[in-house]
Structures are given as C-alpha cells and as structure tokens.
Amino acid sequence: MSEAVTYYKEHEAEDAMSVLAGWMGQNSKVKVIYHSGTAVDADIYKGIIRIPRMACASGITQEALMLLRGRVYHEAGHIDETKLPKAEFPQGALKEILNALEDRRMESVESKKHKGCEIVFRWSNNYFNRKIAEQITQKKADAPLWEALVAMSFMVEGLQPAWRLGGKAQDYVDAAYSEFIKVKQCANTLEVLALAKVIYKLLKEVNDDYKQDKQDKQDKQDKQDKQDKQDKQDKQDKQDKQ
C-alpha cells in the first residue's frame, strides 16, 4: 500500500484519536492538545496529552496516521498505567531512566489490554529506530545517556539499534542492560522506580570512571605542560649564562 495514500482529513484523524485517548486512558475527560511545536508528553496527574499537530494539509498519509496513533496510544497508556505520587517523581538522570523503563513496561501492559496497540507500538519502535540512527549518523545527537537508554529500549523489544553506539553509550549498555531487561517483570511504576535507582547507580559508576579518566589525563597534560615550561626556562637560563 502506498505511503502517499490519504485516509482522513487532518482534523478528522485528530478527533478520532482524542476519543481513543479517553478510552485507553480509562477517563472520558482525557484532553488531547495539538500544538505547532515538537514536544510529545502527557500530564498523568491532569489527564492532558500534548502532541504536535500533523502538517498534512492534503490529508493524513499512512505514515503520519501511524505516527499520530503511536503518540496518542503511548501517552494515553501513561495516563492509564503510570501511577506514581507526584512527590516521588524524580528529576534529572534518574527521571530519564525511569521514563525509558516505564515506557517499556507500560506499552507491554497496554498491548495486552487493547487489541491493536501492539502492532502500533512495534511500528513506532521500528520507525524511531531508523530516525534516531539518522540523527546520530548525521551527528545531530551527542547524549550518551539518552543514546544508551533508547538503545536498551529497542533491545528489550527484540530490536538491534540501527546505528553503532558511541563509546560511552556502549559502556552504559554493557553495565546496565542485564538490569534493564528486568523491566518486564515489574508490576507497577513503583517497582520500575526501584529498578531505575539500581540502574542509576550502575551508570553513575561508569560516568564517574569517565570523569576520573578525564581528570587523570588533564593532570598528566598539566604536569607535562609544566615540565615543558620549566625545560624551556632552564634552556633559556643556560643560554643567558653563556
């Protein structure tokens, strides 16, 4: 089937997805906000989903429709399944790890609850695997933690990352994947948070080693620079005495 075939007018598809979001989120008051930016997120406490408006004036193509479905299903799934007291929601690197893990657990649960979700999530994983590979290959992304987390997310779903991981990202994967894969055993978001904390410690050790190695190299360079400067001065002093 051609990717160029159109199925719905733009707002017809968005309206349909808004209804599905409420059904999946088990809340008829779930609100989907379409905007002109690039952010995709859900406020699980207020039941609000924010996703970019599809720029398809002539109609929604197959790819655009699948992308729209994937975004809405995913964020509605978080509203349905991701339950964590607001005060316990972490920030920083731990938040990134939690989000990556919870994405995998939530999608697995929603795929069992709702017929049709699995094929959409599988399509999305393949789509973003290609897109992320393009970003990294074109040097548009340089974030080892993010790179490692998305790589492990694909690996858990049986996909090999479609790019060669950077050195630090690969070290992160080597250190944490044996724990990351346990996410499918987690029964809820609190258990995922506990797993995220374990992985955070492992990744912090890797990062600390990188920092120490960088500091050692800098210290060595500083020492060499100091010695070179002293040698140069000694040579100059010797010439002055002659």
Regions found by a protein language model. Give the residues of each.
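Basic/hydrophobic alpha-helical interface regions
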Residues: M1-A141, V150-R164, D174, S178, ...
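Pan-zinc metallopeptidase signature
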Residues: K131-K241
